[in-house]
Amino acid sequence: MGFPKEGEKVQIHSYKHNGSIHRMWKETTILKGTQSLVIGANDRTVVTESDGRTWITREPAICYFHENYWFNVIGMLREEGVYYYCNLSSPFAYDSEALKYIDYDLDIKVYPDMTYTLLDEDEYEKHSQIMQYPPVIDTILKRNVAQLTQWIHQRKGPFAPDFVDMWYERYLMYRN
């Protein structure tokens, strides 16, 4: 597996455990790309859902992917502050087509005051049975929910003060 280069524009593909496509982001600019970490940014990019419907993101977003964690984090810059959407997912993979991961349903929404809500537990339970997630996946995801909430409390990684703003400033260099 290679890794995307700084300044490169890539697609992001989200899959379900059974291999079906879940969602695709048309264009994300790579701000940092290494074997273990990818930070990207997009703004008003086209998103295609599994049923073919499309929509356009409303605000600039900084995306954080790490090979050692079963989650990715999207920091969205809004007038009221930075909102985060955290997907519990497999670690990322990258090939010539796109940056890819498996979405495992659970999400954490983090508000500008760093309060958060765990979302889609019912969807996780349903898909866990339908797609027969192995027990090890449940164990890994629970451990990563704990890791993610610890990072939120500690303002670590993508939740660190100024993380999103710093990477957004870098993104602006590629847009102009």
From Swiss-Prot:
GO terms for molecular function: magnesium ion binding; nucleoside diphosphate phosphatase activity; ribonucleoside triphosphate phosphatase activity. Mg(2+) 1 binds at residues 87, 103, 107. Keywords: Hydrolase, Magnesium, Metal-binding. Its cofactor is Mg(2+). Mg(2+) 2 binds at residues 105, 107, 120, 123. The keyword Hydrolase applies. It catalyses: a ribonucleoside 5'-triphosphate + H2O = a ribonucleoside 5'-diphosphate + phosphate + H(+); a ribonucleoside 5'-diphosphate + H2O = a ribonucleoside 5'-phosphate + phosphate + H(+). The active site is at residue 23. The keyword Magnesium applies. It comes from the Bacteria. It is an enzyme of class 3 (hydrolase). It holds the Pfam family DUF402. Its EC number is 3.6.1.15, 3.6.1.6. Has nucleoside phosphatase activity towards nucleoside triphosphates and nucleoside diphosphates. Belongs to the Ntdp family. This is Nucleoside triphosphate/diphosphate phosphatase. It comes from Bacillus anthracis.
